[in-house]
């Protein structure tokens, strides 16, 4: 059995909100000085010790020095700088030649898994999003449509292409893909505003188009093919200009992945690829903490980040190029924290708005990543302690909630736990706040983020950290002290 070396987790975003979750006595407590820093270490049997009272700074992202952009020549640095300031890629790639016609340079084979059930539903004529069926014929694809977040993400992010590809051979799904694509283009001929043109949805959309191009470019209709290719190029240019207006770091990473993929797969893309790689490495360093967990502490966001890098790596493979080492290193960092949230049934726990993700989905994503690793043991900002004894698994939220600027479905779950044994879940949290807008009603989303929706003690029916609108969190828990040690069993 194990317990862990003393560790203090800090959250210092009280200034981001005036709302207090619990009355504070106003008593100032001196911070404990840090005498040492633990090394990131996965469950490899090694033992690292921390001095008692070490304080982890809240949400420390990786430093840029941890993940430097790929090494390039002085000439390429000038090209990247010129492209960043708006010089067209065609002028930098072939200044004396004609502009190349839009086309896809190679076919991508991504191992990123789709959901077959959702793909079958699409072929039957409706979207299947978080358990809700929505007929394609009745879907409003316009930028001004009032859709719930899960529908916005799926419909405008084109993640459904991945599901469709997983449901049947290519020739059987092309008609459905082109039908939905044509309907979307009719309402979104030019870049606009609203959820359809958020950086995240736009980045996911362009990346899906590039990865699954055969599904939307195999028609005999030259007009549709021309429209799709033109839309790819204009979308890539839009992302070049608007990437820094992303709502959060995960959305920015999606945008940078799409820019880099466009640089790989569209003609005259070398300047764009240089621009995209540098931006992506920087954004990844700001998304992920030094133990490999995303700063939102959300397993769903962790899975999304891994999936984006899997798709992008497949784009490099399609062009017979090696991805930057930083991308491979980041994938290796992202997988162990996700595995730390696996129960005995190999599915994920319900944390920070996520639901009980099935074992099959987790296994398929980890296999697609190509990373073989054990669950993260030296947990820092990720905050979830995992204790294994025989056939039982205990998961414990031993950290303050994520900072408001990082959270999308932030939950007041400090000191909550989940327990499973023999493949059965014994104690669980409610979870599901991030899924609100499907079968989970939007009206209860805020309640699912409350302390009372988690398996922990609630004092006076108050949240341990203030739960605000829009997935944000206010003041409350700022520090959690953990004492974990390995004990010999009797």
What are these regions (language model features)?
Residues 2-9:
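Extreme N-terminal basic, low-complexity initiation segments
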Residues 92-118, 133-167, 248-264:
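Long, acidic, intrinsically disordered low-complexity segments
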Residues 149-331:
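Aromatic-lined, polymer-binding surfaces characteristic
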Residues 156, 255, 383, 415, ...:
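Residues that flank catalytic or metal-binding motifs in active/ligand-binding sites
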Residues 289-432:
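Carbohydrate-active enzyme catalytic cores, enriched for enzymes
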Residues 380-391, 463-490:
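Extended, loop-rich substrate-binding clefts of extracytoplasmic carbohydrate-active enzymes
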């Amino acid at each position: 059995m194990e317990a862990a070396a003393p560790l203090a987790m800090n959250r210092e975003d009280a200034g981001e909100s005036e709302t207090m979750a619990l009355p504070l006595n106003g008593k100032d407590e001196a911070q404990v000085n840090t005498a040492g820093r633990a090394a990131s270490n996965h469950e490899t049997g090694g033992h690292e010790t921390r001095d008692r009272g070490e304080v982890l700074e809240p949400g420390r992202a990786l430093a840029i020095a941890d993940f430097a952009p790929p090494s390039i020549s002085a000439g390429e640095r000038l090209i990247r700088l010129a492209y960043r300031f708006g010089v067209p890629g065609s002028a930098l790639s072939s200044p004396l030649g004609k502009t190349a016609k839009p086309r896809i340079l190679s076919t991508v084979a991504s191992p990123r898994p789709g959901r077959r059930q959702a793909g079958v539903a699409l072929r039957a004529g409706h979207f299947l999003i978080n358990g809700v069926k929505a007929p394609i014929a009745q879907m409003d694809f316009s930028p001004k449509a009032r859709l719930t977040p899960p529908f916005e993400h799926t419909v405008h992010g084109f993640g459904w292409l991945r599901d469709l590809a997983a449901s049947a051979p290519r020739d059987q799904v092309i008609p459905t893909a082109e039908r939905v694509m044509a309907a979307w283009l009719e309402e979104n001929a030019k870049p606009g505003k609203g959820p359809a043109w958020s950086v995240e949805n736009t980045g996911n959309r362009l990346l899906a188009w590039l990865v699954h191009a055969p599904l939307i470019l195999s028609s005999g209709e030259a007009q549709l093919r021309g429209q799709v290719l033109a839309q790819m190029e204009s979308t890539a240019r839009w992302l070049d200009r608007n990437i820094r207006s992303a709502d959060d770091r995960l959305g920015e990473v999606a945008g940078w992945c799409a820019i880099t993929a466009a640089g790989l797969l569209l003609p005259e893309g070398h300047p764009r690829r240089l621009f995209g790689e540098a931006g992506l490495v920087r954004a990844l360093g700001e998304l992920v903490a030094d133990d490999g967990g995303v700063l939102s502490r959300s397993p769903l966001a962790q899975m999304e980040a891994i999936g984006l890098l899997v798709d992008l790596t497949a784009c490099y493979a399609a062009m017979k190029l090696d991805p930057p080492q930083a991308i491979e290193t980041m994938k290796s960092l992202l997988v162990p924290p996700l595995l730390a949230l696996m129960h005995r049934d190999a599915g994920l726990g319900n944390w920070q708005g996520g639901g009980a993700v099935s074992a099959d989905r987790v296994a398929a994503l980890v296999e697609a990543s190509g990373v073989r690793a054990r669950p993260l043991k030296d947990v820092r900002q990720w905050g979830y302690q995992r204790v294994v004894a025989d056939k039982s698994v205990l998961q414990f939220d031993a950290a303050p909630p994520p900072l408001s600027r990082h959270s999308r479905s932030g939950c007041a779950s400090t000191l909550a736990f989940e327990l499973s044994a023999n493949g059965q879940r014994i104690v669980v949290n409610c979870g599901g706040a991030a899924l609100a807008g499907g079968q989970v009603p939007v009206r209860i989303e805020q309640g699912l983020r409350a302390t009372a929706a988690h398996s922990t003690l609630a004092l006076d029916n108050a949240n341990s950290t203030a739960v605000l609108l829009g997935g944000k969190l206010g003041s409350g828990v700022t520090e959690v002290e953990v004492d974990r040690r390995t004990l010999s069993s009797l």
